Amino acid sequence: MEGGCGSQWKAAGFLFCVMVFASAERPVFTNHFLVELHKDGEEEARQVAAEHGFGVRKLPFAEGLYHFYHNGLAKAKRRRSLHHKRQLERDPRIKMALQQEGFDRKKRGYRDINEIDINMNDPLFTKQWYLFNTGQADGTPGLDLNVAEAWELGYTGKGVTIGIMDDGIDYLHPDLAYNYNADASYDFSSNDPYPYPRYTDDWFNSHGTRCAGEVSAAASNNICGVGVAYNSKVAGIRMLDQPFMTDIIEASSISHMPQLIDIYSASWGPTDNGKTVDGPRELTLQAMADGVNKGRGGKGSIYVWASGDGGSYDDCNCDGYASSMWTISINSAINDGRTALYDESCSSTLASTFSNGRKRNPEAGVATTDLYGNCTLRHSGTSAAAPEAAGVFALALEANLDLTWRDMQHLTVLTSKRNQLHDEVHQWRRNGVGLEFNHLFGYGVLDAGAMVKMAKDWKTVPERFHCVGGSVQNPEKIPPTGKLVLTLKTNACEGKENFVRYLEHVQAVITVNATRRGDLNINMTSPMGTKSILLSRRPRDDDSKVGFDKWPFMTTHTWGEDARGTWTLELGFVGSAPQKGLLKEWTLMLHGTQSAPYIDQVVRDYQSKLAMSKKQELEEELDEAVERSLQSILRKN
């Protein structure tokens, strides 16, 4: 990421850390190779690949790097293909050849055992309660995305393209065909430009088609329902449907056509089994850094991620995609405002939309498109939540195409609402600058009407800086009872070029081991008194060897706060049996702006979070100006 942790890569103007992973399982090797040539050039790469029996694609985010794939090799096996690796390495034109290891990535579509298979031929618009909640399926009237207001203002997603990174989309579907962007689509599983889902008897590969319909299903055509941004274009990026994922396929997907695709929607991630700690590898991190730095003509690609379906047994801060600063992590609520049974909670979630996962009423699910021209009422999971958010962001982009990836995060914080959301476990709290948040729902449910109105007048936020706020490097034991409490006092790099005054994201980069990792609980409190739960108990995680190795736990809960002062880290165990642990490292990474981000913004609603934040910034600037004047007078005397 954009600061120091683990080993570091310098790419696209960003210094970011490579997450370190360890596993006791035997590695799986795929038919994909990362190849670096001494002399960069696509013609030479094609020639080299052809001579060795490989297909080839250039990686757009790095010079000299190519994706070689061999269709004659098994897609996954336990042993390396040393013959092909050595054959490539002996070629004098090749600088490096690395066979890609495979790893698991799972779709986040929750499936209830009592789900009802209903295919509707009639329009489903009246059943799309997440667009207009009138109380359908015993829902709470008014608890929806407020798209009506955005549509009435004339914003329907026109001119915006959303890429669905998934198992493909049925681009022949009559509700999707008109809005399908073929030029921005690709199949990385089959290496061709036709990302159509692979047929299975159980319709397992319907996931991407359902997500696409939520975003871009056409309006007023008497087919299925209506997309959140029904005049937007949708691109299919097929990359999930294979035995194992590889770093090179993830990176290629995330970096695909960043000048054509505005928003990338991902409803997948590491296995949600409550015991996995995993995230993007080196190439994917590099691709994401390149995307936020160079995508959309330098305004930055917008990555929307489903926060996870592991429920109370998991923590989405153990998912390096959902907890990345470069993604907008989205959780879900059901139609009456309660949490879904599969919802994971963590401090990195920015906001929420809607799905199902608690009610047996079939109409409480998400209505959308399905395979082979069909419709469905049963889409669910945070898989359904992320595309809804992508649709809302498309509406905001139509209102203001100059929005950067960071602008979109600021707008999300400022316009999301508590509404009638109810978390039975975690209370709603206010941070040090008065912004209300929840550990599961983030800053609340997206409000499309409020977002497009604010986006119209929005001025790009100031430059972002990164500061290492301090570090604890001496090993400290975590007691079986009680807590290990550590403090770091920081000036947030004040007086230096990278001073951070107004926070956006905060990372606690931690190396720690425990006799049972799942019983470990980590909290961090800011100088302004905001407590973030960085890691909650995961009862299924029995790990006693790997722990966390330079893992960047992230919080958005201190958004807008002053980073200067004393930060407190607390580590303890929650569980029935006594455990022991050792904290080896804690590094505090601060990310934000030097100047006030909202002081120049236009305020239309004087009851809004923007009005409150701007008022506070003006008061703080005045106080600091008075303090500087007093110090100047004292020095003269």
Swiss-Prot record:
Q: Which CDD domains match?
A: Peptidases_S8_Protein_convertases_Kexins_Furin-like
Q: Indicate where this protein is primarily found.
A: cytoplasm
Q: Which residues form the active site?
A: 166, 207, 383
A Pfam family the protein falls into: S8_pro-domain
Give me the glycosylation sites of this protein. Answer: 374, 513, 523
Write down any Gene Ontology CC term.
Answer: endoplasmic reticulum lumen
Q: Which reaction does it catalyse?
A: Release of protein hormones and neuropeptides from their precursors, generally by hydrolysis of -Lys-Arg-|- bonds
Pro-peptide positions on chain: 25-108
Q: Tell me where in or outside the cell this protein is found.
A: Cytoplasmic vesicle, Secretory vesicle; Secreted
Looking at the record, the residues that make up the Peptidase S8 domain are 128-452
Q: Look up the signal peptide feature and give its range.
A: 1-24
Q: Which InterPro entries match?
A: Galactose-bd-like_sf, Kexin/furin, P_dom, Peptidase_S8/S53_dom, Peptidase_S8/S53_dom_sf, Peptidase_S8_Asp-AS, Peptidase_S8_His-AS, Peptidase_S8_Ser-AS
For this protein, the record's PANTHER family field holds:
NEUROENDOCRINE CONVERTASE 2, PROPROTEIN CONVERTASE SUBTILISIN/KEXIN-RELATED
Function recorded in the entry: Serine endopeptidase which is involved in the processing of hormone and other protein precursors at sites comprised of pairs of basic amino acid residues. Responsible for the release of glucagon from proglucagon in pancreatic A cells.
State the family it belongs to: Belongs to the peptidase S8 family. Furin subfamily.
Question: What is this protein called in UniProt?
Answer: Neuroendocrine convertase 2
